[in-house]
Each structure stands twice: as C-alpha cells, then as structure tokens.
Regions:
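Ca2+-coordinating acidic residues in Ca2+-binding motifs
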Residues: 13, 30, 61
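Residues at alpha-helix termini
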Residues: 17-18, 38, 69
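Major-groove DNA-recognition helix of helix-turn-helix-type DNA-binding domains
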Residues: 21-56
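A short, Lys/Arg-enriched interface patch at domain edges and termini
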Residues: 55-72
Length: 72
C-alpha cells in the first residue's frame, strides 16, 4: 500500500480512505459524523475554514483530520 500523503483531497475520496468497506454515501456520512463526534475536531476543522458543504479538503484540514484520527 502506498504511504499516505498530506495533500488536498476531494472530501469523498478521503472519506473512502477512512471507510474503505463502506459504500460511497455511507463513507461520507460516517466521516462527517466522526468530525462532529470527535472532541475538538469540529472546532479545529472550522478554524481551518471547513464548512458543511466543503467539497475539497485543504492540506491544513487533512493535517487536522490526521491529528485527530490518525492516517487512514
């Protein structure tokens, strides 16, 4: 498996990396839920410019995700 890279990711692509056994829509839901349920993560994402309708995650946002969830 290729080493995970911190880069801009389409939201759905990163969601599927974290939830590879889920269908696309389910992976999106679980990923969003995880952001809300992980203490401090939602606030950190918003501080990096994340909004509910964000389609592409920036490198800074991906760093926050990895900080809270680890690499996919």
């Amino acid at each position: 498996m290729e080493k995970f890279k911190i880069k801009d990711y389409p939201f759905g692509e990163l969601a599927q990396l974290y939830y590879p056994d889920h269908k696309y829509d389910s992976a999106l839901r679980h990923f969003r839920d995880e952001m809300h349920l992980t203490r401090g993560m939602w606030e950190a994402m918003v501080a990096q410019g994340y909004k509910e309708n964000t389609k592409t995650l920036t490198r800074a946002q991906v760093r926050v995700i990895v900080q809270f969830l680890g690499e996919p």
